[in-house]
UniProtKB/Swiss-Prot annotation:
GO terms for cellular component: cytosol. Catalyzes the ATP-dependent condensation of GlcN-Ins and L-cysteine to form L-Cys-GlcN-Ins. The lineage of its organism: Bacteria, Bacillati, Actinomycetota, Actinomycetes, Mycobacteriales. The keyword RNA-binding does not apply. The keyword ATP-binding applies. Belongs to the class-I aminoacyl-tRNA synthetase family. MshC subfamily. It catalyses: 1D-myo-inositol 2-amino-2-deoxy-alpha-D-glucopyranoside + L-cysteine + ATP = 1D-myo-inositol 2-(L-cysteinylamino)-2-deoxy-alpha-D-glucopyranoside + AMP + diphosphate + H(+). Monomer. L-cysteinyl-5'-AMP binds at residues 44-47, 59, 82-84, 228, 250-252, 284. GO terms for molecular function: ATP binding; cysteine-glucosaminylinositol ligase activity; cysteine-tRNA ligase activity; zinc ion binding. It comes from the Bacteria. This is L-cysteine:1D-myo-inositol 2-amino-2-deoxy-alpha-D-glucopyranoside ligase 2. It comes from Corynebacterium jeikeium (strain K411). CDD domains: CysRS_core.
Length: 415
């Protein structure tokens, strides 16, 4: 599947501190693993039944920061993202709206691509739909059955295949939740703890046997379709190997999705960890209320841009808070971001900055971003520069160019 056009990202001179990110599994901020070749990064993509809201955007803008920082530091990045284009929520939305589920998925994927292009997000090298990865999933399910990490229901009308969550002793290391919390999230987030015939209530679906009216693919274990978690396991490991550097997504994916994606890959490939870093972004609320489809209070990127709000301001509004924190989107957040953008542009156009001052500023911004993406501190450093810049004096064009290049290369904001 094709992604979207890559934005022009300028080369940024100068040295960069090593990037350090919080790892959910180890509960610590630690250096990102930089292999001799490329940094492998996998970020879970959308289920295409609704257009890109700010919760989605905040996640992909966070990992765009990581992508940009690593590239500006001279590292290659192999970025992979999936699209869950076969899943129950997609079918349910299509049935509700009286449309074909594939047509709905295609339309929402197209809108997502458009939003990502507008926001100047660097596209993944591999942008893979679940339907494109069926053979990979079948291969991994077969491997899990072979090693004893999975089983097929016997004597059931629908002989689904499940992963035995007790197979690996490290299960639970990624999320660090206790058994009770895992059981609650499993039930709330797409699990089926009461399914008859399972060995354990928390065993996760790997292959769903065909039901009337659902799409199906042939497999050695009967016609059906993939479970949710194993799609990401197969797509990630088949392109990045295991372990790879960064597994990312929203904090709501911490469990069960990322825990099971990891355990499937680890059991199939005989490794202790699927990823060195598990990085999760906070949730975005609207005016103090959690943003959700059920509440009808989603803020869509496409509607903001259609109303005339500049994508660069949307980026700055998202970056005003720390990526790991749950935070609010309000009209004031957007207005402040637009004011910030205008003040930076004014400082570049009319202010005076020496080359040494510019390089010190860029180093400061890089240092804040290297410290677990401390965007608030990075933006404040730029605010201080803009406020302190004397207007009306003859500026150093090289200094202005260096600041402008850094803001574009690191933050994706074109001044």
């Amino acid at each position: 599947m094709h992604s979207w056009p890559e934005p022009e990202v300028p080369q940024l001179p100068g040295e960069a501190p090593q990037l350090r990110l919080y790892d959910t599994a180890d509960d610590v901020v630690k250096p990102v693993e930089i292999p001799a070749g490329e940094v492998g990064m996998y970020v879970c993509g959308i289920t295409p039944y609704d257009s890109t809201h700010l919760g989605h955007a905040a996640t992909y803008l966070t990992f765009d920061l990581i992508h940009r920082y690593l590239r500006a530091a001279g590292h290659g990045v192999h970025y992979v993202q999936n699209i869950t284009d076969v899943d129950d929520p997609l079918f349910e939305r299509a049935e509700r709206d009286g449309v074909d589920w594939q047509d709905l998925g295609t339309s929402q994927i197209d809108l997502f691509r458009s939003d990502m292009e507008d926001l100047a997000v660097i596209p993944p090298r591999d942008y893979i739909g679940a339907m494109e990865s069926i053979d990979e999933v079948i291969e991994m399910v077969a491997k899990l059955l072979e090693v004893g990490a999975a089983y097929q229901l016997e004597g059931d009308e629908y002989p689904d295949i499940y992963a035995d969550y007790t197979f690996l002793p490290q299960f639970g290391y990624e999320s660090r939740y206790d058994e009770q919390q895992m059981a609650e999230f499993f039930a709330e987030r797409g699990g089926d703890p009461e399914r008859p015939g399972k060995r354990h209530p928390m065993d996760a679906l790997l292959w769903r046997a065909h039901r009337e009216g659902e799409p199906k693919w042939d497999s050695p274990f009967g016609p059906g379709r993939p479970g949710w978690h194993i799609e990401c396991s197969a797509i990630a490991v088949n392109r990045l190997g295991a372990p790879f550097a960064i597994q990312g997504g929203g904090s709501d994916l911490r469990f069960p999705h990322h825990e099971f994606s990891a355990t499937h890959a680890e059991a199939a490939h005989g490794v202790d960890r699927m990823a060195h870093h598990y990085v999760h972004t906070g949730m975005i609320g609207l005016d103090g209320t959690k943003m959700s489809k059920s509440l009808g209070n989603l803020v869509f990127v496409s509607r903001l841009t259609a109303a005339g709000h500049e994508p660069a301001a949307i980026r700055l509004g998202v970056y005003a808070g720390h990526y790991r924190q749950d935070r609010d989107w309000t009209n004031d957040v957007l207005a402040h971001a637009e004011h910030r953008l205008a003040s930076w542009r004014a400082a570049l156009a009319t202010g005076s900055t020496t080359l040494d001052e510019a390089r010190e500023l860029v180093a400061t911004v890089r240092g804040h971003l290297a410290n677990d993406l401390d965007t608030a501190a990075a933006l404040e450093a730029l605010d201080d520069w803009a406020a302190d810049t004397k207007t009306g004096a003859a500026g150093d064009e090289a200094a202005a160019s260096e600041i402008k290049t850094a803001i574009d290369a690191l933050l994706g904001v074109r001044l």
